[in-house]
Amino acid sequence: MLSREEQNRCFVPVRRILDNEDLKLFKEGDAYKLIDSFICDLDEAVKDKPISASIPQSSSIEHVLNILDRVGEIKQENPAIDNMGSRFGNPAFQSFYDQVYIETPKLHQVFGIEHNAAMEAGRYFYESFGNRKRIDYGSGHELYFMSWLLILKQLGIFTKNDYPALVVRVFVKYVELMRSLQIFYTLEPAGSHGVWGLDDFHFLPFLFGAAQLVNHKYLRPKHVRDPEILEMCRADYMYLGYVYFLNKLKPSVSLRFHSPMIDDISAVKTWSKVNEGMIKMYRAEVLGKLPIMQHYLFGHLIPASPGMSPAPQDGDDSEVTHVHSHYADCCGIKIPSAISAAKNNGSRIPFD
């Protein structure tokens, strides 16, 4: 466990990436190395481990799973409201978000950490479920969740022995929870590149999912085009499970048309190459993109680089000094997700 003195140096994280110069400093700094190393270490830890693998679960893993269970209960306590058939975000998400925010300090008591440390960890936690104002979710929020786990690791809650379970137990449960929230509240995609992106909402199921399959005897990237294999293997492998979900979400068109990037990747010969490519893509398209990283938060344990802009002083620090994306859904021009389209068309969403 991190010393009490060090924990008391923690503070509520704030934005510090306001322009391209700040992004450059981030990519050259300690925070980037911390995040990148953590993602790569988790990736290595989950290689050749299906979701059904027998993996030890520490009490810390159990605590996190229980916290996610509570978030699921909060969702049920804040039902979606009649949104007059709108395909955009349901306002009830804001009540859900507010309750998660209120309960965050209590949920962190189980870790026995100092107040300041809980405040630093807590902001990454509640921000990982989407944006309250825009009622959207994207890879930046997914990054907040990984940052929450990283903060807990920095505090000494997790060790490297926990890494396999952090992916195939905790992260898998988080993705399932987020999928339920996306459906329940019709969350909009944040920063979606549309059909030409990897996915409207998530990136890491593909990265970690490829790692799971690196040395598989029989399964190859081309098998994502085989519906029978997807059906048989979706419960054990994140990558295949996510493609299965996308196919069910968009049943009227082929993978080639609804997810051309995933279809292109299926031509790669080995999962090892896919995994290497996913890591490079994550660095370039998430950690290296200003429209995503301008919303990222820095505290004591994930520190801003020297020379970065000071935190915005007025208003909501997640909204002011916003740098515009070139995509249509930047700055409030709403784009409904495939999930909302499927609900609107009466398609059955494959989630219970």
Curated annotation (Swiss-Prot):
What are the UniProt keywords, alphabetically? Cytoplasm, Isomerase, Rotamase
List the Pfam families.
PTPA
Q: Known EC number(s)?
A: 5.2.1.8
Recorded GO MF terms? peptidyl-prolyl cis-trans isomerase activity; protein tyrosine phosphatase activator activity
- SUPFAM superfamilies (UniProt xref): PTPA-like
Q: From which domain of life does this come?
A: Eukaryota
Q: Which reaction does it catalyse?
A: [protein]-peptidylproline (omega=180) = [protein]-peptidylproline (omega=0)
Against InterPro entries, the record matches this protein to: Phstyr_phstse_ac (IPR004327), PTPA_C_lid (IPR043170), PTPA_sf (IPR037218)
* Locations listed in the record: Cytoplasm
GO cellular component annotations, sorted alphabetically? cytoplasm; nucleus; protein phosphatase type 2A complex
One example of a Gene Ontology biological process annotation: regulation of septation initiation signaling
Q: What does this protein do?
A: PPIases accelerate the folding of proteins. It catalyzes the cis-trans isomerization of proline imidic peptide bonds in oligopeptides. Acts as a regulatory subunit for PP2A-like phosphatases modulating their activity or substrate specificity, probably by inducing a conformational change in the catalytic subunit, a direct target of the PPIase. Can reactivate inactive phosphatase PP2A-phosphatase methylesterase complexes (PP2Ai) in presence of ATP and Mg(2+) by dissociating the inactive form from the complex.
Write out the similarity annotation: Belongs to the PTPA-type PPIase family.
Protein name in the entry:
Serine/threonine-protein phosphatase 2A activator 2
Give the source species: Schizosaccharomyces pombe (strain 972 / ATCC 24843)
